[in-house]
Amino acid sequence: MKIDVPAGMVRQEVQLEAEEHERVDQQCLSIDPAVYGNVSAMLLIQKVTHRKKPVFGPVEDTTFYKIVGSKELKGDVVQQCDQIYETWKKVGMPLVCVDAGGLGVGYQPILARLRVQVRPITLHGGITSSNRNVSKTEMFSHMQRLFEQRAIRIGEIPHKLQLVNSLERFRATYLDDGRLVYSIKEVRGEHGDWACSCALGLWAMRRGPVVAVGYR
């Protein structure tokens, strides 16, 4: 038997797939000034929400951190601030987080004159943290938890090898009195600046205002 198909009616195939998007919620340029002021480590870290919309069921949001850029800052404080400023403008004027100790003290007035939003963090050896005075133990513990939760992704950045090597030298040790101490083994003059830069940025973005860049 022949069945006549009404005019204009076409066969349609419905593909049942979940929609997935990523949204950059926040960006941070994180800087750990070099111990001797020669080459400092700067990372661009993004806080990303991955949204999955299943055909059936609730929307699933997953937050993770993605390291998308790196740069060695060379020269004196003024020269390094010029490099920070140029990068800051290029990547959309994100939050700048800097270790406020040592060479980092000199960054702040220069970057302030350039109208760069800076969040200085002073590290100490205690166990509790305030807004700007941060315990190294808490900061590194926070980074360790994120890695254990697989919430950090390292992109194809120029200094990926240096960052990974620095993170691999990262150690947590329990002392006899029960305190947890973190350290980074120095190798050929490299003091773990890349790992410290990573930990600083992750700490700075753990809370605070969200700067929505949009889904992509």
Predicted region positions:
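Conserved RecA-like P-loop NTPase helicase motor core
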Residues: 133-136, 140-142, 146
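RNase H-like, metal-dependent nuclease domains and their acidic two-metal-ion catalytic environment used
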Residues: 1-123, 130, 137, 150-216
